[in-house]
Amino acid sequence: MTTKKLYFLSISIIILVAISIAIYITLNSNTKTRLTNDSQQQIDTIIEHDLQKGHIPGASILIVKNGKVFLNKGYGYQDVDKKVKASPTTKYEIASNTKAFTGLAILKLAQEGRLNLNDDVSKHVPHFKMNYNGQNETITIKQLLAQTSGIPSDITSEDSVTNKNNRLNDVTRAIMGDELHHKPGEEFEYSNMNYDLLGLIIQNVTKQSYTKYITNSWLKPLHMTHTSFKQNNNKSKHDAIGYELQGSTPVVSKPEFNLWDTPSAYMMTSTEDLEHWIKFQLNPPDKYKSLVQQSHKNLSSTIGEPNANAYASGWFTNNDEHLVFHSGTLDNFSSFILLNPKQNYGIVVLANLNSEYVPKLVEHLNTQIVNHKRYSTVASMLNQYKDQFNIVTVLMTTLILLAFIFSAYRAWQMRHGKIILRKSKLTTFLSWLTLCLCIAIALILYALPYLILGSNNWSFVLTWLPIEIKLTLTTAFIALFSMLITLLLILHTTTIKKP
């Protein structure tokens, strides 16, 4: 590579990096940031930032810590057209977070001796059978709980199954004799049908409908009096309207659904009701303590699942961080429930849009809770030095202007033949050294939040930094790379001496 090409490559890379960083900081800036020692304001800022980024119309968020409600609040709208604001009483479809109720109900029936987790499913669902390599296979209740039955995740994707069968009995008959993906008990594969079958077992054992049993045995005792199960697409006063994105605009969505999928996906509830569920999960009464602990116990390894080591009874678990959690997604709703029994807190996010920002928001809130004292210290320190940061911003802006003037002058000189590019091994070496320095600085900057605060990223940090500090960071990054460009110009150009 010639010195001239290397020179222009160096300049191009540095400019691109500087522009990218500046754009990234600008896009993640929020002039409404309110960083004080009040955790409520910090958390509001984080929530509003993520909801805005995800174009989420409305959400209700609950944080319970040490048995007390730290936050239970609605953001945005449960109904955009009617301007009905989301609140703690807004009901959302919580999708797969229904599974934890189904799993706990099965464990309770086992504790009562009404079934055994090692029972063959066909003992309670006589017509049920599945094949593996053409041979009939025994599937146990425990394997359904653990998602290791081998039942394919897409087994009910065929229209002939989903549209013509709207009862649990009918759909299990429709798939009877189908081929399993794996031999039961050998491999984890997430499938709603596992928990739909558990719902059918609950019905057959209790001689009640699944919804009636869950309501009478769990929801009412937990005072979850406004929780229900979806029956149709009609909406009542407190029900959130579901939305799907068209571009970046949320539009009302009423997708078809299947009643037989209720034990896996169609509980409707609010953060007001889930407050009781979270408190029960974190601090259960003595008579339920062993049952709740059992429901959090690992049943199968979940290799390949993000952030999860194992699957329990309707929960994913992360043993490294002592987390119990589950996401829930439908075409027009999403939810996420996270528990940390060891540190005694829980987080719930319910939204009326299927958005990847729901789990991101939970991650950010979890980080905020775990590192609250550290953030408060950093926040307090930064606010004390706002004036100094403003001075640094002015100085950095001055450096940028000087670097721009120098670069423009050098470009004018080169165009008029007053300077030429140096060609030597030394300048080539210095060019590569400059590039390596640039990369090293970029890596250090990327890792800075982790080095200072631990296990964070810039996207999260920028949600709560004051605007003064964001401006300082932006100008500092641009000034740094401007000076690198200036250095390259000095190294690679020399004035033509007049004869």
Curated annotation (Swiss-Prot):
Keyword Transmembrane helix: yes
Keywords from the named record: Cell membrane, Membrane, Transmembrane, Transmembrane helix
Spans through the membrane: 6-26, 389-409, 433-453, 471-491
Membrane topology term: Multi-pass membrane protein
Protein name per the record: Protein flp
Localization per record: Cell membrane
Function: Its precise function is unknown. Has no penicillin-binding activity and is not involved in methicillin resistance.
Additional free-text comment from the UniProt record: Has two of three conserved motifs typically found in penicillin-binding proteins (PBPs) and beta-lactamases, but no penicillin-binding activity has been detected.
GO-annotated cellular components: plasma membrane
PANTHER family: D-ALANYL-D-ALANINE-CARBOXYPEPTIDASE/ENDOPEPTIDASE AMPH, PENICILLIN-BINDING PROTEIN 4
Domain of life: Bacteria
UniProt-listed Pfam families: Beta-lactamase
Main localization of the protein described in the UniProt heading: membrane
